[in-house]
């Protein structure tokens, strides 16, 4: 019979350091291994079917939707504000994962310099009511998937997390 269970905190908290590094100077395998080892890899999803991306495969392209039309969706311009370095570093890491394009899809009314000044990407502009901000709709119109192909997607907040991992 168990009368009591005590959970006692450690005197100090320790985190594993995955090390900083510029992803633009790394090869694909190094970027993939760092994302896998750190546990960040599952934020990268593959379409069709919205599964966790298979690191052994290479996508046709990668999409980052910077425009969300879902009801009650957060303002992505606000989320990325003052995080240009993290966002660009995350995009640089994603660009190592494909020989194709990294597309960022923005609203035509965006004022976020972090989106407008992004480098090493193809900026696509969309406008309109929901579902214009849905990444699946964006892929369908901008870079349709054919049989046997994959397109990977990551959200703005995911790109920021990836960027912070490398900084």
Question: Residue locations for each model-derived region?
Answer:
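Buried, small/hydrophobic-residue-enriched core segments of structured protein domains
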Residues: 2-167
């Amino acid at each position: 019979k168990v009368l009591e269970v005590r959970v006692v905190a450690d005197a100090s908290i320790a985190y594993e350091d995955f090390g900083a590094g510029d992803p633009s100077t790394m090869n694909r395998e190094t970027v993939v291994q760092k994302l896998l080892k750190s546990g960040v890899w599952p934020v990268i999803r593959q379409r069709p079917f919205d599964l966790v991306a298979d690191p052994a495969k290479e996508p046709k392209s990668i999409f980052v939707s910077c425009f969300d039309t879902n009801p009650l969706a957060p303002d992505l311009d606000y989320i990325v504000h003052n995080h240009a370095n993290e966002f660009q570093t995350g995009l640089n890491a994603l660009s190592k994962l494909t020989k194709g394009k990294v597309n960022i899809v923005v609203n035509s009314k965006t004022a976020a310099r972090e989106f407008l000044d992004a480098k090493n990407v193809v900026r696509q502009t969309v406008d309109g009511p929901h579902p214009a901000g849905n990444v699946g709709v964006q892929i369908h119109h901008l870079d349709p998937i054919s049989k046997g192909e994959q397109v990977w997607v990551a959200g703005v907040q995911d790109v920021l997390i990836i960027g912070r991992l490398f900084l």
